[in-house]
Amino acid sequence: MHELYQPREIEAAAQTFWDEQKSFEVSEQPGKETFYCLSMFPYPSGKLHMGHVRNYTIGDVISRYQRMLGKNVLQPLGWDAFGMPAENAAIDNNVAPAKWTYENIAYMKNQLKSLGLAVDWSREVTTCKPDYYRWEQWLFTRLFEKGVIYRKNGTVNWDPIDQTVLANEQVIDGRGWRSGALIEKREIPMYYFKITAYADELLESLDELPGWPEQVKTMQRNWIGRSRGMEVQFPYDQASIGEAGALKVFTTRPDTLMGATYVAVAAEHPLATLAAQGNPALQAFIDECKGGSVAEADVATQEKKGQPTSLFVEHPLTGEKLPVWVANYVLMHYGDGAVMAVPAHDERDFEFASKYDLPIKPVVRTSAGDETPAPWQAEYNEQGPLINSGEFTGLHFQDAFDAIEAALVKKALGQSRTQFRLRDWGISRQRYWGCPIPIVHCDTCGDVPVPEDQLPVILPEDVVPDGAGSPLARMPQFYECSCPKCGAPAKRETDTMDTFVESSWYYARYASPHYEGGLVEPNAANHWLPVDQYIGGIEHAILHLLYARFFHKLMRDEGLVTSNEPFKNLLTQGMVNAETYFRMETSGKKTWINPADVTLERDAKAKVISATLTSDGLPVEIGGTEKMSKSKKNGIDPQTMIDQYGADTCRLFMMFASPPDMSLEWSDSGVEGSHRFLRRVWRLAQAHVGQGASGSLDIAALTDEQKAVRRSIHQAIKQASQDIGQNQKFNTAVAQVMTLMNVLEKAPQATPQDRALLQEGLETVTLLLAPITPHISHELWTQLGHNEPVIDAGWPVFDAHALVQDSLQLVIQVNGKLRGHIEMPASASREEVEAAARINENVLRFTDGLTIRKVIVVPGKLVNIVAS
């Protein structure tokens, strides 16, 4: 055994061993308990960042621990390889997205392997490869034929210069993020998943997920947003509108119906179109609205604007004429594109009515009283007894709901309805680097799904996009085809799918990644699924996790899987933060500086008191700790750390610095501390092994001092097992091992019994560290005399007898202040403990001249003598 800890050699040897032995390749073993551990797969951006390292280390620790419990553990990895960054890089560097993506995958795979992950690489999937997306297209065609996928016009953000659709987050201050063009709203045909058909189940089956953080489940509940309310019809005023009909609205507060003073419709609503005829001012406003964002969040925060239409509708209960306004805060794709406005009890309506001097009629008595004077108060939105509401006055919310519903049903102008905030999922993207949508457009047959024997529709990979719309729409060799039904000339769909589709089912493909008979091989899928432990960032709480849950139910209904949910347990890891530094330019702009280029001055307590730029010695500002990012230049390259300290040190620091679900603050001194600890472990083991094999331990013959050492060993096993297995608090498990190391380093090594006990202690340290620092553990286990690798060793089990103490050291207090200790047999009674405490010399000294009023004995811990 080499005298010094040499991580580079140790880690290379361990990884070579695992590769040659195919240690982490698994197959179905009926009768053996399975554990499927999965970390969210990475986008191949080019290089790993510390967030990746943390994510995959957490997953690897859990996987290795479960393997040591004797389970058949599956931990796969792959690549979420389609998406916008590849197109942008292609445009910037004039390189095909495929080439850029595959080069990044090769580099990042080597980086991941250098972390020593226990991954079954034989199951690797890459979502941009036809052998993967072929099955996505296969499922698409089946769902299209069932009506679960459908095509309709949708409102999108259109960039007239780049000739493409932009996501809401790509619209900045009304302009395209790349072109700077003013964005238009456009109606274009798009494909949608009917996720709303599963809204109730997606909501209710959240209750079947006790292993998910409550925060994530709450976010999904709010996103799905089930609300019970009423559909109310306001009959058209035929004199102003010129035809019979009714304006349909949905409200969750039908109790406030008697307070409606106007109605507002979206710019795209048919009544808005009708009113704009011959009204240039209204038409200009409608055009302005159509140029705005289609994002609900943007609409909520923007200034409320509107235009009157000169149209009226009738109040369904009173017959009163209410004016119709076009308002920018009403969205056509939400609800019915119209709202009944009750300014007294809705903040948006209040703001709008105040601005345009519309009537505000209070109809609910709230804790703010019967009136609703400006400014708006949150209390105005409360439920309470009705006022100013005719026959409904005095009724509370539920009674008012029922009575108003009965009155509307009687007049055939309303009914109760459950509505969801969740919209159907539009998946069409006018992008190149994505999975082609397998539809052919035929003038005779309409939209025809591509037959299974013609799948996959292959995306050409030798294309360099220029940013102006989709290249596929300009490639006749791609879109010109024959109709699969009638054989006539037809046109292939040139939109590609939202990349969230690929990540909605990848976890299932890992169960049978090479299966060519379908999306999954059902027996393999049902053997491994659902995933036992899923790990990823909280930023995926809504979209990815909701879409994956939806897809799992689609696969279940297609007979591909039998379970209802994809992920039993979810761990959302915290971010990796680091210190930031900057200089303020005269323009007011901050120029961020990499921490590696900064020299710090610290006080005696190691607190930073000043920072200077190393190159010029001049001061820089300390910006505080923030998430590692390219923009703030505070990222640390994992490869640099691995090259300098080894993967085990990085892994140990990541696990020790913070609980996995909390933010982790990067610390160079913390990394160095982790490295020093591994050197201590190596040094102690090297000294022990150098003295030759130790004999067997005679537990019956242990001295009190040896019993105390053994108690520390088994206390560490007990606590670490609880910390990792039950609580996923890897940081406290590491702390247990560090505490044990302190004991072992001080333990005597003079006798054969001492050496046998140290052998047990070092084996325990090795086993407890094995999931966290697998390379050094691999080497230590061999050096400690074992033939089988540590990955096949079982997790240690604590000996309950070793934890039993013959004697206990108790604290003695006088009037709450520490005055000494006494050693007592563990079996001593309360009376015996009190008697021993009373005659302790320190107690006698501090109670001299006082009367002992009370003696409090806390068994196994302390004695407090109260005297005055």
Curated annotation (Swiss-Prot):
Gene, per the UniProt record: leuS
Family per similarity comment: Belongs to the class-I aminoacyl-tRNA synthetase family.
Cytoplasm keyword on record: yes
The enzyme's E.C. designation: 6.1.1.4
Keywords: Aminoacyl-tRNA synthetase, ATP-binding, Cytoplasm, Ligase, Nucleotide-binding, Protein biosynthesis
Record-listed ATP binding positions: K630
Positions of short motif 'KMSKS' region: 627-631
Single annotated GO MF: ATP binding
Compartment list: Cytoplasm
UniProt-listed InterPro entries: aa-tRNA-synth_I_CS, aa-tRNA-synth_Ia, Leu-tRNA-ligase, Leu_tRNA-synth_edit, M/V/L/I-tRNA-synth_anticd-bd, Methionyl/Leucyl_tRNA_Synth, Rossmann-like_a/b/a_fold, tRNAsynth_Ia_anticodon-bd
Protein name: Leucine--tRNA ligase
